[in-house]
């Protein structure tokens, strides 16, 4: 509304807060749009945005902002302007003056304050080649903290899903006909991948044991591509702006994201990662469409006995592609995880969510409960405990304890099996889910 935006313009109507941004709620993602100009029109305001995000925002169809007649219009907030700094605890970085302005909380003394300014986006990068992969490195009891990620304030940020941002995207009219397995396609998109504090690519058996990933400006740990093996065990992921942990390709940069990914060289696929007994909490604090764990085009990945809480969107996402066509994904397992207090900000959501064809994959003996119910979601009824989304095929969903029987099977392919899920599942399964006894100390780390 014009009342809010007036603080960003001068008496002549010119934008004085030249780095101001709008963060716009878009169904299952939020977009960061840098404001180029503002024109107040009575009780409304017309806002224009910088490129490249302006074109992508108005040309891509999904996810989109909602404008409805029943009051479910998309929420937004304004940020990155000193003129908006009016609540204790807020800060603003003036990049031209090279100053940080901070509004102290009651009782805070700046003379005694510890101030940490992140300067890098990636702390550790492990990368070889397909023919000469980096092998057998173990990180143990190391804390990875305080990274930044500047791209949203330099080029905007229009995610498609799971924090993967569109580098290009547009609507197709008329729709593109695909093979008989898949419904017609109404859009195309190409994706970029957010930065990560620790990046692993073209490697074998890179392990993380009892490490901490905290206070990070984007993804915590990322097994990007061409990684075989690797154990992530007993780690804490907390206070992270984006995704906690990513595994596998979410479509290469030049690959249209709705096309199945099935490389001729199988070494390009991330396989045999084991993620267990980790605690994920306060994830996606800035990029609300992010998850605790997101695995894309992967094979033989095992995600088990983790606890996930306080996330803005889904807890675990497995798969990619929106297609029933068989691809490189197979033999994945999500087992005995405890997911609670999820969907703090976004709907079209579930504790565990799947995409695409994944032969011989299993979602079993997990426990999901306690969804948030924010008042600004696009559809207050569009939430689920378990959700097999577009193209999900050949996946067995069995013996999961959920506090209700609210599930969705949307545009699924063949071969899915749903058995014995809901509140009547044996309480032993509910009690066994989550961190095993030797790792419950993670819940008490300050």
What does each model-identified segment do?
Residues 146, 150, 365, 376-446:
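Extracellular beta-rich repeat passengers
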Residues 19, 88, 97, 290, ...:
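Active-site lining segments that contact anionic ligands and/or coordinate catalytic metals
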Residues 135-146, 184, 204-218, 227-242, ...:
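Right-handed parallel beta-helix
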Residues 250, 319-321, 357, 391:
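Active-site beta-loop-alpha junctions enriched in small/polar residues
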Residues 121, 148-154, 195, 217-223, ...:
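Short glycine/acidic-rich loop motifs that flank beta-strands on beta-rich extracellular proteins
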Residues 1-202, 207, 253-264:
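Extracellular polysaccharide-degrading/modifying enzymes targeting complex plant/algal/animal polysaccharides
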């Amino acid at each position: 509304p014009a009342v809010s935006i007036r603080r960003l313009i001068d008496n002549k109507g010119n934008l004085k807060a030249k780095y101001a941004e709008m963060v716009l709620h878009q169904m299952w993602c939020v977009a960061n749009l840098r404001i180029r100009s503002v024109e107040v029109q009575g009780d409304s305001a017309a806002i224009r945005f910088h490129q490249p995000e302006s074109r992508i925002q108005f040309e891509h169809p999904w996810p989109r902002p909602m404008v409805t007649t029943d009051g479910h219009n998309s929420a937004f907030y304004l940020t990155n302007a000193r003129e908006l700094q009016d609540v204790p605890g807020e800060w603003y970085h003036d990049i031209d003056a090279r100053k940080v302005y901070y509004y102290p909380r009651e009782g805070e003394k700046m003379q005694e304050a510890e101030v940490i300014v992140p300067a890098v986006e990636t702390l550790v990068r492990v990368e070889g080649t397909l023919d000469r992969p980096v092998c057998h490195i173990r990180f143990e009891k190391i804390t990875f903290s305080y990274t930044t990620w500047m791209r949203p304030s330099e080029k905007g940020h229009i995610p498609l899903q799971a924090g993967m941002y569109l580098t290009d995207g547009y609507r197709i009219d008329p729709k593109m006909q695909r093979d008989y397995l898949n419904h017609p396609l109404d859009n195309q998109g190409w994706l970029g991948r957010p930065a990560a504090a620790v990046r692993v690519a073209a490697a074998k058996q890179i392990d993380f044991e009892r490490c901490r990933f905290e206070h990070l400006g984007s993804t915590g740990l990322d097994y990007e591509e061409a990684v075989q093996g690797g154990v992530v065990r007993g780690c804490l992921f907390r206070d992270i702006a984006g995704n906690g942990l990513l595994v596998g390709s979410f479509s290469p940069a030049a690959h249209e994201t709705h096309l199945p990914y099935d490389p001729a060289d199988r070494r390009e696929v991330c396989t045999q990662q084991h993620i267990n007994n980790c605690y994920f909490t306060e994830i996606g604090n800035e990029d609300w469409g992010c998850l605790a764990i997101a695995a894309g085009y992967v094979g033989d990945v095992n995600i088990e006995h983790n606890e996930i809480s306080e996330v803005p969107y889904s807890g675990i996402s497995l798969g990619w592609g929106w297609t029933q066509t068989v691809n490189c994904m197979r033999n994945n397992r999500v087992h005995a995880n405890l997911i609670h207090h999820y969907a703090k900000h976004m709907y079209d959501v579930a504790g565990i969510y799947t995409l695409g064809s994944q032969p011989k994959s299993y979602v079993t003996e997990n426990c999901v409960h306690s969804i948030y119910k924010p008042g600004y979601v696009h559809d207050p009824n569009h939430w689920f405990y378990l959700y097999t989304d577009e193209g999900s095929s050949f996946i067995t969903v069995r013996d999961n304890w959920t506090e209700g029987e609210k599930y969705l099977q949307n545009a699924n392919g063949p071969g899915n099996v749903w058995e014995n899920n809901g509140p009547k599942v044996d309480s032993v399964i509910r009690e066994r889910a989550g961190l095993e006894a030797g790792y419950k100390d993670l819940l008490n780390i300050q």
